[in-house]
Amino acid sequence: MEKVQYITRSALRRASTLEVNPQARQRLQELFVNFCLILICLLLICIIVMLL
């Protein structure tokens, strides 16, 4: 019985991780894009300040 419960739990974990992965990837991509945009903005501000 313990083995069966362990197998079912591991299977459920695998299924849940497979379902969650695309959403997690989208979130990571969005965070990465936002981070890049912020870095670009900071670089632009630094350049403008140096020019002034």
From Swiss-Prot:
Keywords, in A-Z order: Acetylation, Endoplasmic reticulum, Membrane, Mitochondrion, Phosphoprotein, Sarcoplasmic reticulum, Transmembrane, Transmembrane helix
Biological process (GO) annotations held by this record are: circadian sleep/wake cycle, sleep; locomotor rhythm; negative regulation of calcium ion import into sarcoplasmic reticulum; negative regulation of heart rate; regulation of calcium ion transport; visual learning
Post-translational modification note: Phosphorylated in response to beta-adrenergic stimulation. Phosphorylation by PKA abolishes the inhibition of ATP2A2-mediated calcium uptake.
Q: Which residues carry this modification: Phosphothreonine?
A: 17
Q: Which GO terms describe its cellular component?
A: membrane; mitochondrial membrane; sarcoplasmic reticulum; sarcoplasmic reticulum membrane
GO MF terms listed in the record are:
ATPase inhibitor activity
Its predominant location is: endoplasmic reticulum
What ranges are annotated Cytoplasmic (topological domains)?
1-31
Q: Where are the transmembrane segments?
A: 32-52
Q: How does it sit in the membrane?
A: Single-pass membrane protein
Chain positions found as Phosphoserine: 16
Task: Give the UniProt subcellular location, in the record's own words.
Answer: Endoplasmic reticulum membrane; Sarcoplasmic reticulum membrane; Mitochondrion membrane; Membrane
Keyword S-adenosyl-L-methionine belongs to the record: no
Tissue expression per record: Heart.
N-acetylmethionine modifications at = 1
Query: Is Signal a UniProt keyword of this protein?
Result: no
User: Tell me, what does this protein do in biology?
Assistant: Reversibly inhibits the activity of ATP2A2/SERCA2 in cardiac sarcoplasmic reticulum by decreasing the apparent affinity of the ATPase for Ca(2+). Binds preferentially to the ATP-bound E1 conformational form of ATP2A2 which predominates at low Ca(2+) concentrations during the diastolic phase of the cardiac cycle. Inhibits ATP2A2 Ca(2+) affinity by disrupting its allosteric activation by ATP. Modulates the contractility of the heart muscle in response to physiological stimuli via its effects on ATP2A2.
According to its UniProt record, which protein family does this protein belong to? Belongs to the phospholamban family.
What's the subunit arrangement here? Homopentamer.
Q: What name does UniProt use for this protein? A: Phospholamban
Question: Which organism does this record belong to?
Answer: Gallus gallus (Chicken)
Q: What gene name does this entry carry?
A: PLN
